[in-house]
Design a protein with these regions (language model features):
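Non-catalytic linker/capping segments at the edges of enzyme domains
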Residues: 1-43
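HotDog/MaoC-like acyl-thioester-processing domains
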Residues: 1-6, 88-90, 99-137
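Short, electropositive, low-hydrophobicity segments enriched in small/polar residues
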Residues: 20, 50, 57-58, 95, ...
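Hydrophobic core residues within well-ordered beta-strands of beta-rich domains
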Residues: 23, 32-34, 76-78, 94, ...
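Residue-level recognition of well-ordered beta-strand positions that form the cores
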Residues: 37-39, 81-83, 97-99, 113, ...
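A conserved, well-ordered hydrophobic junction motif at loop->secondary-structure transitions
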Residues: 37-59
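Generic alpha-helical structural signal
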Residues: 54-55, 72, 119
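Hydrophobic beta-strand-centered segment that forms part of the acyl-chain substrate-binding groove
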Residues: 62-95, 100
Length: 137
């Protein structure tokens, strides 16, 4: 990925603090897992009052890549697999968390889950990510 500008201009759709159309996600890192909480407004629905699966996939991907950044690696998703378990209703807050499954050189396998407040898991994901540079400190 040489030649790409990987600097953060705070316009990321998921976490960019300067993106007025973004989700404004903030993350917590406990040394092993990254987590965030989000609820989607109606403008992000697919079917009536159901969050579009693409948006949920985006947040699952974001939390997995953010885990690697917090662990010191800028990474890009090479493969993403999402399993939708239950419909997510517009406005329902979810916790999305990610953890490392495996690390081999520059390749990382990461998992994530999206869970309602009552503990119901609405989606889970796995990704293969490739480190592209050390994360800025």
């Amino acid at each position: 990925m040489s030649g790409l500008d990987l600097s953060d201009d705070s316009m990321c759709f998921c976490c960019g603090s300067r993106n007025p159309d973004g989700l404004g996600l903030e993350f917590e890192f406990d040394g092993r897992e990254v987590s965030t909480t989000v609820s989607f407004p109606k403008k992000f629905q697919g079917y009536r009052d159901i969050v579009h699966g693409g948006l949920l996939s985006t947040v699952l991907d974001e939390v997995m890549v953010t885990l690697l950044i917090k662990m010191g690696q800028l990474a890009a998703t090479a493969e993403l697999s999402v399993r939708f378990l239950k419909p997510l209703r517009v406005g329902d807050p979810i916790e999305v968390r990610a953890w490392l499954l495996e690390s081999r050189g520059r390749v990382f396998r990461v998992a994530a889950a999206a869970t309602l407040k009552d503990g119901t898991e609405v989606a889970r994901a796995e990704s293969t990510c490739v480190a592209v540079a050390p994360a800025p400190t």
